Amino acid sequence: MAIGYPNGKKYAASHEVLPQQKRKAPVTYGKRGMSLEDDLNDTIAYYLTHEIAVIHKKPTPVQIVSVDYPKRSSAKIKEAYFKTPSTTDYNGVYKGKYVDFEAKETQNTTSFPLSNFHDHQMTHMANVLKQDGIVFVIIAFQKLGETHFIPFEKFYPFWERMQSGGRKSVTIAEIQDVSDQIPYGLNPRLDFLQSIDKLYF
């Protein structure tokens, strides 16, 4: 059967082969776009809203180098650099105790590199521990979907081992041995206060 257009022309079928479309991988919606920092920020916001704990993320200090003043009433930063933070990322109060911790994540599946920490952070956490504060490290192995709560007094020996010429990383087995795994939830996302309750209260 011939097909005709309203203008009277005949339809000419094209015999060109269309390129085959590539199959897309299925989309996974779990934890999409979420980092450890996002999860912790959501968690501490939940704690604050529900008056469970007061914990805040400290802003990263910035060194401003150059500022442009296009108008008297406005300023535009032209050049700035992140300073190395002198303490940890998070601090606050829970059940009358000072809480201080550092959070790190890695894509590694077998170990955590200690180069993610700095001397001044270790010194700060050791000082908090001396004052009887609750101080710990949260480490997330993103590819494994595991997040670990490690009391500082159990984490610090790994740092000392590296300082004395030993391993520059902590194996996943070592971390699992000294940590409390934090399960992912909805609200709060990463309920690390469960670990504090279990280990300190």
Swiss-Prot record:
It comes from the Bacteria. This is Holliday junction resolvase RecU. It is found in: Cytoplasm. Keywords: Cytoplasm, DNA damage, DNA recombination, DNA repair, Endonuclease, Hydrolase, Magnesium, Metal-binding, Nuclease. GO terms for molecular function: endonuclease activity; magnesium ion binding; nucleic acid binding. Belongs to the RecU family. The keyword Membrane does not apply. Binds 1 Mg(2+) ion per subunit. The keyword Ribonucleoprotein does not apply. It is an enzyme of class 3 (hydrolase). Gene3D superfamilies: 3.40.1350.10. Endonuclease that resolves Holliday junction intermediates in genetic recombination. Cleaves mobile four-strand junctions by introducing symmetrical nicks in paired strands. Promotes annealing of linear ssDNA with homologous dsDNA. Required for DNA repair, homologous recombination and chromosome segregation.
